Amino acid sequence: TNKSDNDNIITSFISLTCNPNYRYRNEQAQNRKGRLQSDTLSELISYSIGCQMGRYSLDREGLVYAHEGNRGFAELVAEGAYKTFPADNDGILPLMDDEWFDDDVTSRVKEFVRTVWGEEHLQENLDFIAESLCLYAIKPKKGESALDTIRRYLSTQFWKDHMKMYKKRPIYWLFSSGKEKAFECLVYLHRYNDATLARMRTEYVVPLLARYQANIDRLNEQVDGASGGEATRLKRERDSLSKKFNELRSFDDRLRHYADMRISIDLDDGVKVNYGKFGDLLADVKAITGNAPEII
């Protein structure tokens, strides 16, 4: 080939990471294809979350929003930057292991798949995503629906993958009530502003507390009228929900404290510094900042 031919090759399109034999050279040959498929679908989910946050858009190429404090975001929306697939209006995405919110990450991933590939093949595509994730990212679970598998990936594995992808400097931050996972949500650091925590409380945490309480009351009534194995199952469900309720109440107290402080972040300080400003409201603080959470 001559020089002009070489000049026509856009080097950014050449990547050994798309070659499973190179990318997974330390793995057994028979596992490489499945690993590539699983990783590719994990990356698709990450991209769809980027579209949900407004970082990316189906209507524009490249990085669409990466300013500070949500500034200029409303203008982008007004000029139609997110027409095909609307970005989330507050940059707070509930990441729940059950269906407590209509607009949680799992339902928005489903909406994204529907928008891009159409209603006709929606179930087929969800099945393919779920099967692909089970090739490596998570273990298969018998009798689980495709959407439940995707939800399980999102609530148990997505954050670990995101931390790895961004080398412990995440751009989507995981707010977490604790080990019971009573409430978790992702916040896009470029859209975070000093009103984000107050909104997280009023729009998500406080309504969820009421929902938990209503469900506990309902289960208490059902326990009274049940016996044997059914009563045992209902009690187990109630006790699990009570643990979540107590964890969430404690999280809400701490969240209110930090929301009242109206904390700002300065992107120039970097993720490591900014991530440490929220005490133990965020997950994996020590892994990111190098220090245990500092409670203010």
Spans of features found by a protein language model:
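Terminal accessory regions of large proteins
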Residues: 3-296
